[in-house]
A protein has these predicted regions:
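Acidic catalytic loop of the alpha/beta-hydrolase fold
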Residues: 371-375
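Short alpha-helix in the alpha/beta-hydrolase fold that links the catalytic acid
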Residues: 376-385
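Short beta-strand/loop motif that positions the catalytic acidic residue
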Residues: 360, 366-368
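Alpha/beta-hydrolase active-site loop
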Residues: 162-183
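N-terminal cap/lid segment of alpha/beta-hydrolase-fold proteins
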Residues: 54-87
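Alpha/beta-hydrolase-fold enzymes
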Residues: 26-33, 184-189, 200-344
Length: 429
């Protein structure tokens, strides 16, 4: 019986990926004009004719827009979008806008912060309040898919070693690169940081590895949809992924990325959600809240969001997340005993040492919810038990799922205003 369930789940995965692979070339390489980041590529292709929608949205709200390319120490090229100041402000103004980073979560990109209208969008609310806003991206999503050596690390090739990364590399390479670049460009010694989901997890991991860097670089920290660990996560999606070992399927397909679909696939998802928004809502609710409808996201607008989501990631990253759930350890990537001994000199990978958080002195604000199956108070204790609560405030929200923190208009009054007050209280503006 277990074998049949595993086979059925595996066949479904194969069917989905068959559709994906059919839209690639015979070599497994994506057509550059309809790549895994098709929406972004489309806007880039037509950039000279019409400003991209995200740039237009920012400009229409009354702000300048900039795009920056950031090189990591291991050769990945990340994209960051900047909202530096109002259009009405002189270029050589003496006004200093303190920088703040907004870092997306798993399967996501910087698009996610801009899907609401300007009056409900966190980055534009922050910009209106006087901040220099940076929407950063981690490697391998729809916005950051470049490498300085594209011959050997070709993101358009679904089999490429470009995709050999997980949240560990995002924490060790991407986050420091983004922070250092923004400090250099703005001239500020410290920046503030807002992370959603994985965006908060990589912050914690970097602190566990290099606490001095974070203490010297971060002024204030905010986490929404906070995930410190997923040892007891109630997400049916995580539980299914951990229960049904998909590694044999993935190894057979030899495909290394996940949800990095091309334009055809995005079109299918978008049209499906447009004509069947109720079914689409049910699927999304299953993913982000185990089927519970919090009624915070407009289902009629949901289909629009799938022009820009999911943002994509690597299979190795997903595997690393599932290892955390199955092994009940927040540790480095588990390659198996033989390779672990070679890399770590141990049968099992070392855990990230959160005991260093006992010396954590950065003012922090964290949000969790009773309707978020990816996060709960029990798992949060893996972090908070180490923290001096003098520096940390935890907000327990009711009836917010994992995406409501980003895509619900209710978040403006329930969360974003509180974030502004927190930042102002800690002298960021």
């Amino acid at each position: 019986m277990k074998y049949k369930k595993r086979t059925s789940f595996g066949l479904l995965t194969v069917m989905i990926y068959f559709i994906y692979l059919k839209s690639t070339s015979k070599t497994g390489k994506l057509d550059p004009l309809v790549s895994e980041s098709s929406h972004y590529r489309y806007f880039q292709k037509h950039y000279k004719k019409t400003p991209p929608v995200y740039q237009q949205k920012i400009n229409d709200a009354g702000f300048f827009f900039e795009e920056h390319k950031i090189l990591t120490s291991d050769g990945y090229i990340l994209t960051a979008w900047r909202i530096p100041r109002k259009l009405s402000e002189p270029t050589f103004s003496d006004i200093k806008h303190e920088p703040i980073i907004l870092q997306h979560g798993l399967f996501d990109s910087s698009f996610t912060w801009l899907l609401l209208d300007a009056s409900h969008s966190l980055p534009l609310i922050l910009a209106e309040s006087g901040y220099d806003v940076w929407l950063t991206n981690t490697r391998g999503n729809a916005v950051s898919f470049e490498h300085e050596n594209m011959n050997n690390f070709n993101s358009y090739d679904v089999y490429s070693k470009y995709w050999d990364f997980s949240f560990h590399e995002m924490a060790v390479y991407d986050l420091p690169a983004n922070i250092n670049y923004i400090k250099k460009i703005t001239g500020f010694d410290k920046v503030s940081y807002v992370g959603h989901s994985q965006g908060g997890l990589i912050y914690n991991i970097l602190y566990s590895i290099n606490p001095t860097f974070i203490e010297e670089s971060i002024k204030n920290y905010v986490s929404v949809g906070t995930v410190a660990a997923i040892f007891t996560a109630e997400s049916k999606l995580i539980q299914l992924g951990a229960k049904f070992d998909m590694s044999w399927i993935l190894n057979a397909l030899k495909v290394k990325n996940f949800f990095c679909f091309n334009e055809k696939f995005y079109s299918i998802i978008n049209n499906f959600c447009y004509y069947s928004n109720k079914i689409c809502s049910l699927i999304v609710n299953f993913i982000v809240s185990n089927g519970k409808d919090t009624n915070r996201i407009n289902p009629k607008k949901l289909f629009e969001n799938f022009l820009y989501a999911p943002g994509g990631t690597s299979f190795k990253n997903i595997s690393h997340w599932l290892q955390m759930y199955k092994n009940k350890r927040l540790a480095m990537y588990d390659y198996g005993k033989k390779k672990n001994r070679k890399i770590y000199n141990s049968d099992i990978p070392p855990e990230y040492d959160f005991s260093v958080f006992q010396n954590y002195k950065i003012k922090s604000l964290m949000y969790i919810s009773d309707s978020d199956p990816f996060s709960n108070e029990n798992d949060l204790k893996h972090l908070t038990d180490q923290l001096n609560r003098k520096y940390v405030t935890i907000r327990k929200m009711s009836n917010y799922n994992h995406l409501d923190f980003l895509w619900s208009e209710d978040a403006k009054n329930d969360i974003y205003k509180d974030i502004i007050l927190f930042l102002q209280k800690n002298n960021i503006s």
